[in-house]
């Protein structure tokens, strides 16, 4: 995200979710237009889910990482609104080159290895 910001004239809004207290946000501040925070405890920012902080229609593109249930909800919302979405998938990876098939995930294009083919995929490929 930070590399894209440096290379293109774009505005980045960072939406982050934490259990109780935020961290490392000052490292992102120089590169983003706005930082939105949600915490489970309500200690900082919005009390609730990070997905509550955004209306995807206000964005041209959404990039997400985190719990799969959150990414799925966000990606499906983006798909429904016609907003480009990228998801960063996580799996336990044994070999890192796709040989062991330990990180295989079923996609719209068949089984793909997260380590070799990803880890970032278009939301439509994973959650369509």
What does each model-found stretch correspond to?
Residues 1-2, 90-119:
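Local cysteine-cluster metal-coordination motifs and their immediate loop/turn environment
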Residues 117-128:
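Short microdomains enriched in Cys/His and/or Lys/Arg
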Residues 51, 98-102, 127:
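Short amphipathic alpha-helical patches
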Residues 1-90:
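FNR/FR-type flavoprotein reductase catalytic core
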């Amino acid at each position: 995200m930070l590399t894209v910001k440096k290379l293109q004239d774009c505005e980045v809004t960072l939406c982050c979710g934490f259990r109780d207290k935020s961290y490392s946000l000052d490292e992102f501040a120089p590169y983003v237009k706005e930082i939105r925070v949600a915490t489970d405890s309500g200690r900082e920012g919005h009390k609730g889910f990070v997905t509550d902080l955004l209306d995807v229609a206000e964005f041209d593109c959404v990039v997400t990482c985190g719990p799969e249930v959150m990414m799925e909800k966000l990606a499906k919302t983006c798909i429904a609104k016609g907003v480009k979405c990228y998801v960063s998938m996580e799996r336990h990876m044994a070999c890192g080159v796709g040989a062991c098939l330990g990180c295989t995930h079923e996609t719209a294009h068949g089984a793909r290895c997260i380590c070799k083919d990803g880890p970032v995929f278009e939301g439509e490929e994973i959650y369509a």
